[in-house]
Amino acid sequence: MSTITITPISTFRTDDPYPFCPGCGHGPILDRLNEAMTRLDLDPANVVIVSDIGCSGLSDQYFTTSAFHGLHGRSITYATGIKLANPDLEVIVIMGDGGTGIGGAHLLSAARRNIGITVIVMNNLNFGMTGGQHSTTTPEGGVTSTTPHGNLEHPLDICATVGVNGAAYVYRGSSFDKDLADRFVAAMSTPGFALLDVWDLCTAYYVRSNKFTRAGMEESMRSWGMEPGLLYERNVTEYATGYRAAHASIAGSSVAGARPVPVDYAHTLARPMSLVVAG
């Protein structure tokens, strides 16, 4: 009998170079993600990377996994549906601080449900792709193209927000963390909602406007009351698992068929018509 030898995958990356600006932290973050997936010996066919809009939204095309690219701020909703439909998939969301703010309600719901997805927030404190506008994580006093005299809004603490709402694993760090791949491994190994708020430098805009540096970023975390490190780790029931257990008694049963729509009015149209609703 012949023996089949399976060679472990050495990388999940394609051969294409990243499109990010020189000094941008997005590339190192993706490299650490690639390292983590390789160490976990995942099957690319069972991994789905979900992204939306912005510089972070370019990420999924540089991996050999399945991917879903959708609307700004909605990546968590897509990921939730994918995980509920097939709980055996490893579902990873890559989003920016812009998408996090736009999809804030989705973020809260995913944390409350403790749905088993891993969310990586590439947090560079502004909307980098569209010209450096301020986002929900831009610090007070931060200079951006939309806050030229300094941001007046208090920044969103992403980790505290999901932490108090039930997330199973919450970590804050930066693209410079030596153990970032370890953190990704731990997050993806957590049977529940895991979020990593990974700060990085937007060298095109925020760095230039604020003279922001690596040392300044790490000091800012503490001075702004946003301590780095593992902030929450809980052993709670994952939503997709709990949902199936709660509905086990009706699993496989048929659902109601489509109901006919009664015709109340006749039409006088002689040809097909199209209607566009915009809003």
Where are the predicted features?
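Flexible, low-complexity linker and terminal segments
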Residues: 1-6, 10, 15-19, 199-279
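Thiamine diphosphate
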Residues: 1-128, 181-182, 271-279
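Conserved thiamine diphosphate
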Residues: 8-11, 88, 135-189
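Short coil/turn connectors at secondary-structure junctions
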Residues: 16, 43-47, 86-91, 112-118, ...
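Short catalytic-loop micro-motif centered on adjacent basic/acidic residues
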Residues: 20-22, 93-95, 169-174, 195
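Conserved active-site and cofactor/substrate-binding residues in soluble primary-metabolism enzymes
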Residues: 25-32, 44, 73, 77, ...
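Active-site-proximal loop->helix
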Residues: 105-111, 129-141, 161
